[in-house]
Amino acid sequence: MTILKWALIFFVVSVIVGVLGFTGISAASADVARILFYIFLVIFLVLLILGLTIFRA
């Protein structure tokens, strides 16, 4: 019974993702993810440089 339950859960998830993937929602979320990636990359690089220079113990 649990295998059938998991198969049904994955079917529902795949249908939802398929519906969202064939609309404009995926493109919008990809743009948001790209912007967040670059923001966190800049924050990481700033903290890395500060950690190697100013905040060295």
UniProtKB/Swiss-Prot annotation:
Domain of life where this protein originates: Bacteria
Subcellular location: Cell membrane
Keywords of this entry: Cell membrane, Membrane, Transmembrane, Transmembrane helix
Claim: Protease is one of the keywords in the record: no
Short name of any one Pfam family annotated for the protein: DUF1328
InterPro entries attached to this UniProt entry: DUF1328 (IPR009760)
Transmembrane segments: 6-26, 35-55
Any one GO cellular component localisation term in the record: plasma membrane
Record's bilayer topology term: Multi-pass membrane protein
Family: Belongs to the UPF0391 family.
Protein name, per record: UPF0391 membrane protein RPC_2356
